[in-house]
Curated annotation (Swiss-Prot):
Binding site residues for S-adenosyl-L-methionine: 78, 83, 129-130, 148
GO MF annotations, alphabetized: rRNA (guanine-N7-)-methyltransferase activity
Name by which UniProt lists this protein: Ribosomal RNA small subunit methyltransferase G
SUPFAM superfamilies: S-adenosyl-L-methionine-dependent methyltransferases
GO cellular component: cytosol
Gene encoding the protein: rsmG
InterPro entries the UniProt entry points to: rRNA_ssu_MeTfrase_G (IPR003682), SAM-dependent_MTases_sf (IPR029063)
UniProt-listed HAMAP family: 16SrRNA_methyltr_G
Main enzyme class: transferase
Protein's cellular compartments: Cytoplasm
Length: 239
């Protein structure tokens, strides 16, 4: 099946419509991703069909959350090659997007993608979540934080919840073992000012891959001691 139809049919299966211009933007993104991937390690997924499903449809599946709206400010924490932030920006062009990554080479790649796709209101930050989450320019400034499964949930919430303003949401993509992770992370979520408001299982179109979508609402401010200094959240997660 050609890539264009995977995107169109896949989005329809996930419950929303993607237009031809958005499809073209994502296909351009795929071309740049695979070209840059020959020079640096951006993704282990290089088969075109797999890029469509495991990167693009996977990222866009966040739209299934009832809490994600088409406008507002969003930070993608540890965005890597731009997932899920850039596909969400393509779908919701009014989102003001910040892409945070600790590797400068990846940030340069993200700048090129955004320029080639004609994306506006995209901000690029080279840094670590633990440090940026303590800076006034980023702390509790965003309606949404998003992240793919870059760490266990009790670590991830310390990276991400400090960025979210009270009344905003952390939208997190995790593997299928979500209930157990939530149980192990309940105290961390509460301490950091969050409350679980949505969880759902999603099977990606054209695959047997099932993952979980978790939404945590920020209901009170994060105590100033969080996030702790770089490396501490992963070495000593909040119990």
């Amino acid at each position: 099946m050609e890539s264009k139809m995977i995107l169109k049919d896949g989005c329809q299966e996930l419950g929303f419509h993607i237009d031809d211009n958005q499809v073209q933007q994502l296909l351009t993104y795929k071309d740049i991703l695979l070209e840059w991937n020959e020079k640096m390690n951006l993704t282990a997924i290089t088969e075109e069909e797999e890029v469509m499903v495991k990167h693009f449809l996977d990222s866009l599946s966040c739209i299934q959350s009832q809490y994600l709206k088409e406008e507002g400010t969003m930070i993608d924490v540890g965005t890597g090659a731009g997932f899920p932030g850039i596909p969400l920006k393509v779908y919701f062009p009014k989102l003001k997007l910040t892409l945070l990554d600790s590797l400068n080479k990846r940030v340069e790649f993200l700048k090129e993608v955004s320029q080639e796709l004609g994306l506006e209101d995209v901000n690029f930050v080279h840094g670590r979540a633990e440090e940026c989450g303590q800076e006034e320019t980023h702390r509790e400034q965003y309606d949404y934080a998003v992240a793919r499964a870059v760490a266990s949930l009790n670590v991830l919430v310390e990276y991400c919840l400090p960025f979210v303003k009270v009344g905003g949401y952390f939208i997190c993509q995790k593997g299928p073992q979500l209930k157990e992770e939530i149980q192990n992370s309940q105290n961390a979520i509460t301490v950091l000012g969050g409350k679980v408001v949505e969880q759902k299982e999603i099977t990606l179109p054209f695959s047997d891959i099932t993952h979980s979508l978790l939404v945590i609402e920020k209901i009170k401010q994060t105590p100033t001691k969080y996030p702790r200094k770089p490396g501490t959240p992963s070495k000593k997660p909040i119990k």
